[in-house]
Amino acid sequence: KLNQLLNLNGCIVFEIPDSSKLVRNYDYTMPWEEHLYYYSPRTFFESLNKNGLSIIFSNKINYSYEDVIYAIVKPSKIIKNKNLLPVSTLKKELSDAKKYSMYFEIKKKMVKDFFKKERKKGPIALFGAGHMSVSFISFFNISSYIDYVLDGNKNKIGLYMPIGNKKIYNPDILKMKN
């Protein structure tokens, strides 16, 4: 346990992504992060308490894509509540998670149908050869619809995506391909 690494005057600073917005917005690329846990502010703070850590200060910073929760904590001899949170107190989190999981197949079909329709109009280029693109291509099984993966990072150009064996091109290729 982390609280055993500190004396009673020591502090730990945690900074974690707030998964709430991503779940509510059906962002299915979120699991690429491979965290063991995906927290809302409430579940994060409860987890700290259950692990014998007292919150000195906390805040949430809102960003356009993913919000960040941070907390400065210190060891506590008193754990406010050793019991798990009652399910009834997590209605919002559970409802959001259920919708997130139930909507995936619908969203996947919508994405595939969109790419199938657009592919008939001509080649498709995906901008960005990062983890989000890999997740997007993989989770929605759309590699067969992607003709070009473009990225301005010179260290990526000429390499291949780990999904679909798609070569990564400099965005300038669009000028040549018209």
Residue ranges and their predicted role:
Residues 1-26, 38-53, 73, 134-136, ...:
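Conserved SAM-binding loop
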Residues 60, 66-73:
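Conserved ATP-utilizing enzyme core subdomain
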Residues 35-39, 60:
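Extended, H/D-rich, highly charged conserved domains that either
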Residues 14-17, 58, 127-129:
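Generic beta-strand/beta-sheet core signal
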Residues 32-36, 102:
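Short, contiguous acidic/charged loop-to-helix segments that flank catalytic cores in large enzymes
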Residues 70-178:
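Hydrophobic, well-ordered beta-alpha structural blocks that scaffold small-molecule cofactor pockets
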Residues 26-32:
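Short glycine/proline- and charge-enriched loop/turn segments
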Residues 53-63:
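Conserved S-adenosyl-L-methionine
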